[in-house]
A protein has these predicted regions:
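Short aromatic/hydrophobic "clamp" motif used to bind/position activated sugar donors
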Residues: 13-14
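Conserved donor-nucleotide/metal-binding helix-loop-beta segment in metal-dependent transferases, i.e.
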Residues: 8, 20-49
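Glycine-rich, basic loop-to-helix element that forms the pyrophosphate-binding segment
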Residues: 1-4
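A residue-level structural signature of the nucleotidyltransferase/glycosyltransferase Rossmann-like core
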Residues: 20, 54, 70, 105-106
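Basic phosphate/pyrophosphate-binding loop/patch that engages nucleotide-derived ligands
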Residues: 30-41, 57-73, 80-84
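A recurrent flexible, glycine/aromatic-enriched loop bordering the glycosyltransferase active site
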Residues: 42-54, 98-101
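Conserved nucleotide-sugar donor-binding
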Residues: 10, 52-64, 111-115
Length: 169
């Protein structure tokens, strides 16, 4: 990330992970808007539907993380921002309350996640412009859909915890 940010003179970026198939472009835009208002180091979306938003990161803060980290395994990099006390952390602002759900899993890690996404995407005429609100509305109307994969959420969270390491110099 740092190499790309430096090469293209980027001051701030929002990540969108490849396994978050329904990452919400509107939420990503909110991350950019918030940075331009506040210039914080790190923006997170605690409590948002899993897979709808990841993080907004300032290049200046990322450079500092790269200087202090003592590991090349940084897949679970957020702890370098949130647990070191070195950075200004903000929660994503101006988000619809509908997007705050802890009972929906929108990330692709297991076979049943694929089945979940397949069901979601085939439920809409235009699956290429879905918002988190659209998905939540569908799942409210058809709650059995979220049961396809939500049982995997605790296993996934534990796996994330097991892979998270904070190693500083």
């Amino acid at each position: 990330w740092l190499g790309a940010a430096n090469k293209y003179s980027i001051d701030f970026f929002v990540t969108a992970d490849g396994d978050d198939l329904l990452c919400d472009p509107h939420l990503l835009d909110l991350g950019f808007e918030q940075y331009f208002r506040n210039t914080s180091d790190f923006i997170q979306g605690t409590g948002l539907v899993c897979g709808s938003f990841t993080y907004g990161i300032s290049t200046k803060a990322l450079k500092k993380v790269c200087e202090i980290k003592d590991s090349t395994d940084t897949e679970m990099m957020w702890v370098y921002f949130t647990e070191t006390g070195l950075f200004e952390i903000e929660e994503l602002e101006n988000v619809s309350e509908v997007c705050y759900r802890d009972d929906i899993r929108m990330t692709m890690d297991y076979e049943d996640d694929y089945q979940f996404f397949k069901t979601i995407l085939t439920s809409f005429k235009d699956p290429y412009s879905l918002s988190t609100e659209d998905v939540v509305e569908l799942l409210e109307a058809e709650p059995h859909i979220k049961e396809i994969n939500f049982y995997l959420h605790e296993k996934w969270k534990q796996n994330q915890i097991n892979k998270t390491r904070l190693k500083v110099k």
